[in-house]
Amino acid sequence: MTCQVTQKAREGTINPIFTCQPAGAQFASIGIKDCIGIVHGGQGCVMFVRLLISQHMKESFEIASSSVHEDGAVFGALDRVETAVEVLLTRYPDVKVVPIITTCSTEIIGDDVDGLLSKLEDELLPTKFPGREVHLLTVHCPSFVGSMITGYDKAVHDFVKKFATKDEPSDKINLITGWVNPGDVKELKHLLEVMEVKANVLFEVESFDSPLMPDLEHHSHGSTTIEDLRDTANAKGTIALNRYEGMKAADYLKKKFKVPAVIGPTPVGIRNTDAFLKAVSEMTGQPIPAQLVKERGLALDAIADIGHMFLADKRVAIYANPDLAIGLTEFCLDLEMKPKLLLLGDDNSGYVKDPRVVALQENAPDLEIVTNADFWDLESRIQQGLELDLILGHSKGRFISIDYKVPMVRVGFPTYDRAGMYRHPVLGYGGAMFLAETMANTLFADMEAKKNKEWILNVW
């Protein structure tokens, strides 16, 4: 058998793996300090996305809606945007960045949001908010094409394009994290800190894992500042961890400001983390210190303790954001596991030419890769006889795990039916250790439930 990359055989979608473009743009916007986005569309385009993110992070945050109703969908709804901007700026005096995120309905009716924002900058802002720093921009998200991944990538590009300003050269690098968890940001910043590398960490959500303090002070907002975004044009280079969640912005900085760019690999597992640290070292001239060599060794030791005996030859199905899903598949191969099914949940034609996917086709002969996939592609294959030992993916696939009694490790977005998953990294050496041990523990619990409560290590 050879690894095949195929597109979903059906036209319709049964239980999608991804949601639509505006969700990705909203997730990018919450990584910016003093930023509240306005989603130009129906209230559901905000409510359900905000619910997903809040369930995942276990934190509250602000996203506004222009609340387009039936009349606006027929006759146009630009007046709703104008009202929304004025109300938002009045109610939140500290807000400096207001992206207008379009949706399928407002893109179809052709609302000229760009033209309206020019009008607001000339009339509303000088009149109602004189002397106040306010930045308006449009993020076009026609949600009838692409997915939340497309929307995130577009938003990252549009924010960088809006603010990047050439000035004196900086000693920092740009790190575009992509769609990650607070625990991942913490791990990435730790790696950079140990290497004594300064960075503009873009669209970072570490503060969504924030403490409850005695004075009741509580913040859960993004930490990337306007100054960080402006300084991206002056950096030593850009590292975009994810090909589909930041490459457009990295390419823009490279073409416009001659900022060197490195795209990936997503640092899932030992091998990819090694590549990430090598890229940082080459870009900055900083050596990889002994502390990180030790952390790498600890991760390797933890993996050696469980890898061959408990993980080897285990059959896995994987779905998640594309860069994460591909990274997880590569890590599973490194652990001697057998990835059987990789589901990529949108119709990006670039997947077939992705060098990582090409490598998977060469190195994983038993793997089937399905693009534009949905959960029926997983469930139907199980019904047809696909035997799996483990599923890796977000919480939306939990019913397949339950119904077919296949143990599942929650990873990716959204994860809301297991406590604290957003707090633990899956990137870096710490993430490699956490992932391997979580997979092993999940298999242990499943074996105890199905086979022998007093299991013997050397017989399974």
From Swiss-Prot:
Enzyme class label: oxidoreductase
Catalytic activity: N2 + 8 reduced [2Fe-2S]-[ferredoxin] + 16 ATP + 16 H2O = H2 + 8 oxidized [2Fe-2S]-[ferredoxin] + 2 NH4(+) + 16 ADP + 16 phosphate + 6 H(+)
Highest taxon above the source species: Bacteria
Residues the record lists as binding [8Fe-7S] cluster: C20, C45, C104, S143
UniProt cross-references to Pfam families, sorted A to Z: Oxidored_nitro
Cofactor: [8Fe-7S] cluster
Cofactor binding summary note: Binds 1 [8Fe-7S] cluster per heterodimer.
Signal sequence range: none
Keywords, comma-separated and alphabetical: ATP-binding, Iron, Iron-sulfur, Metal-binding, Nitrogen fixation, Nucleotide-binding, Oxidoreductase
GO biological process, one term: nitrogen fixation
EC number(s) stated in the UniProt entry for this protein: 1.18.6.1
Molecular function terms from GO: ATP binding; iron-sulfur cluster binding; metal ion binding; nitrogenase activity
Family that this chain belongs to: Belongs to the NifD/NifK/NifE/NifN family.
Record's subunit section: Hexamer of two alpha, two beta, and two delta chains.
PANTHER family: LIGHT-INDEPENDENT PROTOCHLOROPHYLLIDE REDUCTASE SUBUNIT B (PTHR33712:SF7)
Job description of the protein: This iron-iron protein is part of the nitrogenase complex that catalyzes the key enzymatic reactions in nitrogen fixation. Other nitrogenase complexes utilize a molybdenum-iron protein or a vanadium-iron protein.
The protein's name: Nitrogenase iron-iron protein beta chain
Organism the protein comes from: Rhodobacter capsulatus (Rhodopseudomonas capsulata)
Gene designation per UniProt: anfK
